[in-house]
Amino acid sequence: MLTEVCKMGTNKAFFTNEVPEDRYIAAEKISSLKKPATVMIIGDVDTGKTTLTIYLANELISRGFRVSIIDSDVGQKSILPPATISLAFVDTHFSSLEDLTPFAHYFVGTITPSQFFGEMVIGVMKLAELAKKFSDVVLIDTTGMIYGPGVELKRMKIEAIKPDLILALERENELTPIIKGFEDITLKLRVSDKVKEFSRSERKELRREKWKRYFENSRIVTFNVNDILVTGTSMFQGKPIEEGEKNLLERLFKWLILHGRKLGERYFVVKVDTSEGPRVVDKNVVRYFDFSKLSNLLLGLLDKEGFCQGVGILKAINFSEGRLEVLTPVKDISIITEIRFGRIRVREDGEELGLLDREVL
């Protein structure tokens, strides 16, 4: 049987050969599709999506097909690093997605897709287009976000990617709002009784181990914002605020402003409070960000094609010199043309320090 177990503290899903009958039916269905074929696997958390992906990839390899896998479960990534969508090509049998060598990544910048629908859809689209050039079958493993906004996210992915087959792992028709209208390309599969459920704390611990492993053998690299494209933040958009404007804002709100930009008629400032107490700030006029929250912020290091070559942790920033000091395991920095700011703070030991709302930065 296929089992979901915790092994060495880093992964949940592993391959075995005994599977429910409907998994064989799924493999037969995929084998009969016109190639290249794209298959999207959906289901709630802890329904065996990754386990199914592993089984199908191994079975299809045995049948002589070229297979690729897109791991888009940003919060429970098997193909490192977290907070990205990753593509790997399968050239031999394997037992865990962690065994695969990633070919390309797309940076999302957080471990929850709720405020990042654009990145989630575009990332899977770009990687699927790339994968189809070299694969007979593209298997897309997805997040367990299937309720509320998750319905719209899954439907947007289906509309954008146009999969040839949707494999729906469900218990009691909970996927109906997602697959309604796509029944002709959907195959429903039952959730195995052997699937293990993981608590929030267990998931966080799994992520901690993966962050820690990813940042092993990292080094500090310096980037200059004047020499590289910086996205995912308003910090370097618009024009610098004038000294008089800076002084006025500091007096009004009891701030020390370390960096400020004027974006049309609005201001964006990075500040430190100089006194305690409440402040009434019209965020339609002034957006502000606490300097301390820049520490250990996750950054994506992108190439000219928009693919993520790896991620880094912001360790220091010098606004006057435009200098960013980034801890990263990425070796070839020469191909990095863009730095994209994420919305999770994490240390290199894997400890997550918190998520940021998309609009704050």
UniProtKB/Swiss-Prot annotation:
- What is the regulation of this protein's activity? DNA kinase activity is inhibited by 250 mM sodium chloride whereas RNA kinase activity is unaffected.
Q: What class of enzyme is it?
A: transferase
Q: What does this protein do?
A: Polynucleotide kinase that can phosphorylate the 5'-hydroxyl groups of both single-stranded RNA (ssRNA) and single-stranded DNA (ssDNA). Exhibits a strong preference for ssRNA.
Any idea which UniProt keywords this protein has? ATP-binding, Kinase, Nucleotide-binding, Transferase
Chain positions recorded as ATP binding sites: G43, D44, V45, D46, T47, G48, K49, T50
Q: State the organism of origin.
A: Pyrococcus horikoshii (strain ATCC 700860 / DSM 12428 / JCM 9974 / NBRC 100139 / OT-3)
Question: What is stated on temperature in the biophysicochemical properties of this record?
Answer: Optimum temperature is 55 to 75 degrees Celsius using 24-mer 5'-OH DNA as substrate and from 55 to 85 degrees Celsius using 24-mer 5'-OH RNA as substrate.
Reaction equation(s) it catalyzes: a 5'-end dephospho-2'-deoxyribonucleoside-DNA + ATP = a 5'-end 5'-phospho-2'-deoxyribonucleoside-DNA + ADP + H(+); a 5'-end dephospho-ribonucleoside-RNA + ATP = a 5'-end 5'-phospho-ribonucleoside-RNA + ADP + H(+)
One GO MF annotation is:
ATP-dependent polydeoxyribonucleotide 5'-hydroxyl-kinase activity
State what changing D73A does.
Answer: Abrogates kinase activity against both DNA and RNA
Instruction: Give cofactor(s), names only.
Output: a divalent metal cation
Name of the protein this chain belongs to: Polyribonucleotide 5'-hydroxyl-kinase PH0197
User: Its domain of life?
Assistant: Archaea
Entry's pH dependence statement: Optimum pH is 4.5 to 9.5 using 24-mer 5'-OH DNA as substrate and 4.5 to 6.5 using 24-mer 5'-OH RNA as substrate.
KW Transferase (keyword) present? yes
EC assignment: the record states 2.7.1.78
GO BP annotations listed: RNA processing
